[in-house]
Amino acid sequence: VAQNIQLEVKYKMYVKIHETENKDIVAVCDEDLIGKKFEEKGLVLDVSEEFYKGEKMDEKRTLEIMKKADILNIVGEKSIDLASKNDIVSKMNIIKIKGIPHAQVF
């Protein structure tokens, strides 16, 4: 008996929590940007594995963590879009380096 199984493919993002004494810094990036570096007009966006490559999470879990973060560092179209749609980051705070959106939220 054959069964039709439909799997919902959700986009995953890397989420890494850097704990300090006073605040938690959360780094979020699109999975396809890990390890890449972008430079434009003296600005450098280094999506290093050390800082960004934490646990791969779906949008729901990523959003839960974003909402609780003291400081956010977000890179990539999908990650920024998730934060923007949920009023975590304002469009005014988003910069683009080589077309890659980036925002910091304090």
Model-derived features with residue positions:
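N-terminal amphipathic/basic-hydrophobic helices that include classical n-h-c signal peptides
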Residues: 1-10
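Short, compact, well-ordered microdomains
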Residues: 73-106
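Short active-site oxyanion
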Residues: 66-72
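Charged, low-complexity surface patches
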Residues: 55, 72-73
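Conserved mixed alpha/beta catalytic, RNA-binding, or beta-rich assembly cores of soluble enzyme
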Residues: 11-64, 103-105
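Short, surface-exposed linear patches
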Residues: 47-52, 68, 94-98
